[in-house]
Structures are given as C-alpha cells and as structure tokens.
Amino acid sequence: MIDKGISRVWLQHYDKEVSANLSYEHISMYEILARAAERHPERTALIFNNWRVSYRKLKVLVDLAGTNLRRSGVRPGDRVAIMLPNCPQAVISYWACLRLGAVVVMTNPLYMEKEL
C-alpha cells in the first residue's frame, strides 16, 4: 500500500501514455506458472547447460515434486529450506513449495551446519 502523503516525484518523468498505477489480478505465483504452461506450453521456461525445459514440462515436474512434498508432510505455511545450486531442481523445488503454500527459504548450498 502506498502512503498517499508520500510525493512520487518520479511520476513527472513518465510519458503521458504511461499509467502511474498498474492493477494486477490477485493470483498465486503457482497460478502464474500454470497459466504460462496453458498459454505457451512449448515455449522454453528453463535453459540449463544444453537442457531446455518447456513450460508444460516444468509444470509437470513441479506438480510431481509438489505431490511428493505433500506426501512427505509439507503443508501450507510450513517453511521449506532449499539448499541447491542454481539448477533446474532448485527452480522445480521452489515452484513446488509455492504450489503447496509453503514458505520457501532459499539457502546457500555452501553453508556449513553452524551457518544454518
């Protein structure tokens, strides 16, 4: 929420056709992924080395990971630490947690036990 008393001086630099306010549909992050998979199923969502993952495939992998997390006992509001390098599995895990309503805690995979 923007405090109406705060001056937004940058707006004076906007072109006339640029809106000062944007309205967004209130949907979950997972719903954004689901819609992308529906609208652009064959478009590339991820590239890792020479591996390309389409939005359709990403959603399938996220749903599978989410199902397994739920079976493991993860529930909405639970905190889930993801301790992976920048790789597809980190992305899939992130979206799977969001699908379940869990809170994602991204950690550095190089952390030692005392740093966690």
Model-predicted regions and their roles:
Residues 107-109:
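Short beta->alpha connector loops at strand-helix junctions that form conserved
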Residues 98:
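Anion (oxyanion) recognition and catalysis
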Residues 101:
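Structured binding elements
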Residues 21-25, 30-34, 42-87, 91-95, ...:
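Conserved AMP-binding/adenylate-forming core of the ANL superfamily
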Residues 1-26:
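Flexible, non-catalytic linker and terminal segments flanking ANL/adenylate-forming cores
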